[in-house]
């Protein structure tokens, strides 16, 4: 069997798959416009906004990709108690075959990456986020949601962007819970310390 045939069969199998995605939720904002002059105030381009488009990012994007390939996704993560979190939740609610279960943490903002694009090129990216580890109460709520979701799924994807949700303790406990149920674990890793993902099936 060729690699292309094997990939085609794996993609087709996603039509019957229910995947749990856990990780760092983000809102991607794309600000589309044009640059046709330099500011008289400083040697910087003047960006003229024409359109803006929000999209699910981070682990949220992984879950929407699972759905796009024909699967069913349950997404678990953390948002802030803010407008960006509400926008992201609304976007995810519009996705068929995707259930988003989020813990709202009032102590941190929803991670937002805003990209300014002109003439097909990124001009600037602005990040609004905090990267500290989630607290004990949020961790407990997160693990409770994961416990409830694991019996329903056939695979687990850990989407780690280093934003403080998948702490070493959370990773260890999630991977152990999945292993106890013989659930395949796939990791989209952050950094080079792959020991954090010990016992995961695929990194």
Describe the residue ranges of each PLM region:
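Ribokinase/PfkB-type carbohydrate-kinase core domain
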Residues: 1-36, 51-203
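Divalent-cation-assisted or electrostatically stabilized phosphate/pyrophosphate-binding catalytic cores
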Residues: 43, 47-50
């Amino acid at each position: 069997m060729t690699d292309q045939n094997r990939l085609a069969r794996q993609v087709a199998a996603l039509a019957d798959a229910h995947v749990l995605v856990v990780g760092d939720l983000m809102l991607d904002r794309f600000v589309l416009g044009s640059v046709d002059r330099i500011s008289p105030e400083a040697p910087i381009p003047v960006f003229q906004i024409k359109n803006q488009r929000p999209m699910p990012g981070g682990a949220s994007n992984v879950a929407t990709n699972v759905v796009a390939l024909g699967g069913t996704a349950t997404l678990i993560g953390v948002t802030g108690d803010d407008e960006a979190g509400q926008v992201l939740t609304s976007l995810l609610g519009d996705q068929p075959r995707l259930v988003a279960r989020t813990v709202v943490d009032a102590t941190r903002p929803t991670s937002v990456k805003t990209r300014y694009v002109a003439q097909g090129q990124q001009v600037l990216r602005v990040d609004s986020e905090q990267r500290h580890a989630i607290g004990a109460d949020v961790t407990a709520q997160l693990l409770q949601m994961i416990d409830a979701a694991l019996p329903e799924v056939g695979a687990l994807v850990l989407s780690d962007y280093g934003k403080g949700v998948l702490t070493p303790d959370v990773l260890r406990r999630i991977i152990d819970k999945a292993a106890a149920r013989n659930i395949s674990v796939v990791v989209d890793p952050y950094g080079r310390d792959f020991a954090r993902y010990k016992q995961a099936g695929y990194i």
